[in-house]
């Protein structure tokens, strides 16, 4: 599988969308991140301690119900792009490396 791009979502309720190309040539697009809510990349621009606390709270809340091992799932994309590293660029690079995309 190959990550084609991550860009602003065309869904008015979501922040971003990721499009993947499967080995058979078909594409899959996943919209993720609730628009209007803050994430780690936003919190990290301000108080670093608050950002760490918000990240810990997010992870504790979402660990139960989210699929963080399927890179095409909204849960994995939110976890590894929005709640991983302080910048989206760094998180996307880590996401690609983590899932060999």
Q: Language-model segments: which ranges?
A:
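Arg/Lys-rich, low-complexity, intrinsically disordered basic segments
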Residues: 1-101
